[in-house]
């Protein structure tokens, strides 16, 4: 097992026309995330029981239909937010990939969480993303683009903070062959990294609240 999380940076309320937004980076990988809502939804898409989610990931270039990541973020938000509090409404979350030097999926998930925190959404639990790759039987956390390209397997964990404060798997997407022992090892590596990301959330939000109170 090798590596550690690259340096994280975040600027909240980055986009002035959004209800919540963030410019978030890990190393040289950077995204812009924004959210709008809860707001009105077209009658054909409205639910009597819960808020609907509109999730969109857009790469800086190439195909913008990043369906796997959209599904992971959608599944994660369904667990992290009590959607039943806002029936007949919708919330839109958009993530733009600005620069990709690896771990884009994890960075996109983290940026989406920051945008929702900036919006003041009531969470059941916060969430984050952690990417692990396998290179020559070695597991590497938060890989660069070069390390991803050399990998024989990738697993993206969407992690929620459990009621006991410990990380729990919320969603997962794996590429390549992974046996149970390898997945268990990857999850063991991801857990302390998820805790470090949650601590970073707390630091950033404390800074935001202290500024807002001035």
From Swiss-Prot:
Q: Where in the cell is it found?
A: Cytoplasm; Nucleus
Superkingdom of the source species: Eukaryota
Protein keywords: Apoptosis, Cytoplasm, DNA-binding, Exosome, Nucleus, rRNA processing
User: What InterPro entries does its record include?
Assistant: ExoRNase_PH_dom1, ExoRNase_PH_dom2, ExoRNase_PH_dom2_sf, PNPase/RNase_PH_dom_sf, Ribosomal_Su5_D2-typ_SF, RNase_PH
Q: Please indicate if the UniProt record lists Membrane as a keyword.
A: no
Null allele outcome, as annotated, is: RNAi-mediated knockdown results in retarded growth, accumulation of apoptotic DNA in 1.5-fold stage embryos and delayed appearance of embryonic cell corpses during development.
GO CC annotation terms, alphabetical: cytoplasmic exosome (RNase complex); exosome (RNase complex); nuclear exosome (RNase complex); nucleolus
Task: Cite a single GO BP annotation.
Answer: nuclear mRNA surveillance
Query: Molecular function terms in GO for this entry?
Result: 3'-5' exonuclease activity; double-stranded DNA binding; enzyme binding; RNA binding
Which Pfam family is one of this chain's hits?
A: RNase_PH
List all disulphide bridges recorded for this chain: none
Give the UniProt family note: Belongs to the RNase PH family.
Function noted in UniProt:
Non-catalytic component of the RNA exosome complex which has 3'->5' exoribonuclease activity and participates in a multitude of cellular RNA processing and degradation events. Involved in apoptotic DNA degradation. In vitro, does not bind or digest single-stranded RNA. In vitro, binds to double-stranded DNA without detectable DNase activity.
Q: How does it assemble?
A: Homodimer. Component of the RNA exosome complex. Interacts with crn-4; interaction promotes the DNase activity of crn-4. Interacts with crn-3, cps-6 and cyn-13.
**PANTHER family registered for this protein in UniProt:** EXOSOME COMPLEX COMPONENT, EXOSOME COMPLEX COMPONENT RRP46
Q: What is this protein called?
A: Exosome complex component RRP46 homolog
